[in-house]
Regions:
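Juxtadomain coupling helices with adjacent low-complexity linkers
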Residues: 192-194, 199, 210-211, 226-272
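N-terminal helix-turn-helix
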Residues: 2-96, 256, 260-264
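Amphipathic alpha-helical regulatory segments at dimerization interfaces
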Residues: 33, 48, 98-109, 115, ...
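Short, solvent-exposed recognition segments
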Residues: 2-10, 135-208
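Short loop/turn motifs at secondary-structure junctions and domain boundaries
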Residues: 108-109, 206-211
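Sensor-regulatory modules in signal-transduction proteins
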Residues: 219-222
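Short hydrophobic beta-strand micro-motif common in sensory/regulatory domains
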Residues: 213-217
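Amphipathic alpha-helical effector-binding/dimerization core
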Residues: 75-173
Length: 272
């Protein structure tokens, strides 16, 4: 015999759960639309989805903050690096298309691997690369990650941030590189980043892989924001002081050229 359930005992979904469900549904609808037709402005998204502009504005701001969307200089929205990683559309990014031209020029000069990376939380994420023809080379691929505090690409992006921002990314202060070098906490990292900022480029001598040298320069938009890092990776067996100087100089020129191509772009940093 079943026991009647009193009215006060009836199970119902809490308002907070209903609200969260609606919020997720709204967010996914915005992402679906951006995947199909971006870039779009707030008014266009609002009209297409039949949503209040204030709701669209709130959702898009959260997506931008989390790296799922980006906003251009005309305040239109497009998919961010996190969404592009899932959709496989990274090759369509304007910055990646422009990178191919700059990379070809650099390879013609030095025949060394050149990569494009963005900051993804506490890690540096490769979104494009062109490889050297040498049999001895860095073995990596698009989608690979390295600790931002240890890599040349990560450091060149972190150097554009304040100490407070960097400290928030690495709150525990335990900084050991993949090859076992232990930094003396955040103070040493801050010192390294200050030097990177002063030099205009970052270097890495065997901190992410034994036998590997890397140099990286920032790619900036017209506002001076760092969009990405342009990085070359060279086995230490092929590096001399003279060759290192030429590589860094030509990499800086390549970074400036790429910055000119993508001056209008917003940032791609994905925050956790």
């Amino acid at each position: 015999m079943s026991t009647p359930v009193a009215q006060s005992e009836t199970v119902s979904r809490p308002d907070s759960q209903r609200s969260a469900s609606v919020g997720v549904h709204t967010t996914l609808r915005v992402l679906d639309l951006l995947a199909a037709r971006a870039p779009l402005g707030l008014s266009e998204i609002s009209r297409e989805l039949g949503m209040p502009k204030s709701t669209v504005h709130r959702v898009c701001n959260v997506l931008v903050q989390r790296g799922w969307a980006v906003r251009d200089h005309e305040t239109r929205f497009d998919l961010g690096i996190r969404a592009l990683r899932l959709s496989g559309r990274a090759e369509e990014l304007p910055i990646v298309i422009a990178f191919r031209t700059v990379a070809a020029e650099f390879l013609a000069l030095h025949d060394e691997t050149i990569c494009l990376a963005v900051l993804d939380g506490a890690e540096s994420l490769f979104i494009a690369l062109e490889e050297t023809s040498h049999p001895v080379r860095l073995v990596t691929s698009v989608g690979s990650k390295t600790p931002a505090f240890a890599s040349a690409s990560g450091r060149v992006v972190l150097a554009a941030q304040s100490n407070d921002e960097v400290g928030a990314t690495f709150p525990h202060g335990s900084l050991v590189t993949p090859t076992g070098r232990r930094l003396n906490g955040l103070p040493e990292l801050f010192s390294i980043l200050a030097q990177v900022s002063e030099n205009g480029y970052a270097e890495n001598w065997e901190e992410t892989a034994v036998g590997l040298y890397a140099a990286s320069v920032p790619v900036r938009n017209e506002r001076g924001n760092v969009l990405a890092a342009l990085t070359t990776c060279v086995p230490t067996s092929r590096i001399t002081q003279e060759r290192r100087d030429r590589i860094v100089a030509d990499l800086q020129a390549a970074g400036q050229r790429l910055s000119q191509f993508v001056a209008w772009l917003p940032t791609f940093a994905a925050r956790r």
